[in-house]
Curated annotation (Swiss-Prot):
It is found in: Secreted. It comes from the Eukaryota. Keywords: Secreted, Signal. This is Secretoglobin family 1C member 1. The gene is Scgb1c1. The keyword Disulfide bond does not apply. The keyword Signal applies. GO terms for cellular component: extracellular region. InterPro entries: Secretoglobin, Secretoglobin_1C-like, Secretoglobin_sf. Belongs to the secretoglobin family. SUPFAM superfamilies: Uteroglobin-like (SSF48201). Residues 1-23 form the signal peptide.
Amino acid sequence: MKGSSALLLVALSLLCVCGLTRAEDDNEFFMEFLQTLLVGTPEELYEGPLGKYNVNDMAKSALRELKSCIDELQPVHKEQLVKLLVQVLDAQEDT
C-alpha cells in the first residue's frame, strides 16, 4: 500500500507541476509515465515522459526511490499491475 500511495502522489504531483492542460495529453502522459515506471528505468523516465521537463535533483532522487519500491514488489504483484495497465491501454484504444 505504501508503494501505491507513493506512486499516486508522485504521479498526481507531476501532472500538476507539469501543467498539462488537455485531457488526452494528461492520459497519454500518465499512461506512458506508469508504463515506464513499471517496466523501464529511471533514465527512460527522464528521456521519455519527463523528457520535455526540467526534473530537479530532488525529484530525480524521489523517482529513483519510487522505482526501487516498484522493482522490489513481488513478481506476481508487479505482473498484475502490468496487466492492469494493458487493460487500461486497450480500453483507451477502443474509444
